[in-house]
Structures are given as C-alpha cells and as structure tokens.
C-alpha cells in the first residue's frame, strides 16, 4: 500500500517527508522523518526542509496555490531540483520546472524504485544518523517547542494550536 512503500523509500534513503494537505498522514506525524505539511502557513521546519533540500521528489504533488503559498518561491525555492511523479503527464513541470518528470502511478513508481535500489544493493541506512535528517529534526523540535505554549493556552477565542491538539487527543 501507499503508506508502506513511501515509508520504506523514506527510511531506506533517509528522506525527510513533507506532505501536501491532501496526503497528510501517509506517514505517521510522530515519525522522525515526518516534517509536516507544505504550505506558507505550515510548520517552519517543513518549509525549511523544502528550501534546503538537494532534490525534491514530488510524488503526486500538483504544486497548488495552497501548497506553494501562491505559486512563488516562499515554499519551493527558485533553483529547486525537482523530480516530479504524477499520473497526469500534463501536471509535470506545469508550475515549476522539473529536472525529471515521470508519468505513472506513484505507488508503482515508488515500488519500482525500491526494486532498483534492492537490485543495486543500496542498503537501508540508519536514517536517524544522517546529518540532513538530524538538521531538519532539530528544526522540527525547535518548532514543536515554540508552539507548545500555544497548545496549552487557555486564551479565548481558542488558539488554533490548542484546538488541533485537543482534537487529536479526543479522536481515536
């Protein structure tokens, strides 16, 4: 399934995962490679991850207005090296230029990529030891610490961080 192959790829290659609003939850939010949702209003560590990535592997992402903060370069950097995978060939490079565009079902493309990695004996690395993962994880932790007081706030009207925190606690 999509979650399993994405997580396998991310862990095997030590790739921090920034989701789009429509794909949030493909890997658990508490996974050390989960960097939140790409959006101008998203967590700063998600934007930092995209702004500083060597390569952006965009899986089924159409780079919509919400995700990109208005199609500019506030979320996706101007000089980004993007590999875009989409089932719709007209989506490839439509918003941002791509270094490589791959037409196909993202689950199938990821599964094929994993097979190639296995054939080439690219072993699973301890992703938590990757300097890049350590860097973005530190940014994530800093952000989590900065919003912790907002999650506990008793202010009226309710703070959005408190609202979402309480909803997460209440829902199964």
Regions flagged by a language model, labelled:
Residues 2-8, 69-72, 166:
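A short acidic, amphipathic alpha-helical/loop segment
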Residues 2-22:
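Redox- and metal-dependent alpha/beta enzyme cores, enriched for Fe-S-associated oxidoreductases
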Residues 4-8, 98, 109-111, 115, ...:
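Conserved catalytic alpha/beta core of Sir2/sirtuin-type deacylases, generalized to analogous enzyme cores
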Residues 6, 135-172:
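Active-site diphosphate/adenylate-binding microenvironment
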Residues 11-15, 55, 115-123, 138-145, ...:
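Generic secondary-structure signature for well-ordered alpha-helical cores
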Residues 19, 38-42, 157-159:
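A general structural motif
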Residues 23-135:
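Glycine-rich, acidic loop regions that bind phosphate or pyrophosphate groups
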């Amino acid at each position: 399934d999509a979650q399993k192959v994405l997580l396998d790829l991310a862990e095997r290659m030590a790739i921090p995962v920034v989701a789009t609003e429509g794909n949030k939850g493909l890997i658990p939010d508490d996974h050390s490679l989960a960097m939140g949702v790409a959006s101008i209003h998203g967590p700063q560590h998600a934007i930092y991850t995209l702004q500083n990535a060597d390569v952006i592997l965009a899986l089924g992402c159409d780079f919509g207005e919400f995700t990109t903060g208005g199609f500019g370069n506030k979320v996706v950097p101007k000089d980004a090296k993007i590999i875009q995978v989409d089932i719709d060939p007209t989506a490839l490079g439509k918003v941002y230029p791509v270094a490589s565009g791959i037409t196909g079902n993202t689950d199938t493309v990821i599964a094929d990529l994993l097979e190639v990695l296995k054939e080439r004996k690219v072993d699973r690395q301890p992703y938590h030891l990757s300097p890049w993962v350590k860097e973005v994880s530190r940014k994530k932790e800093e952000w989590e610490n900065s919003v912790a007081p907002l999650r506990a706030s008793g202010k009226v009207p309710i703070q959005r961080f408190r609202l979402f925190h309480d909803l997460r606690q209440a829902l199964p």
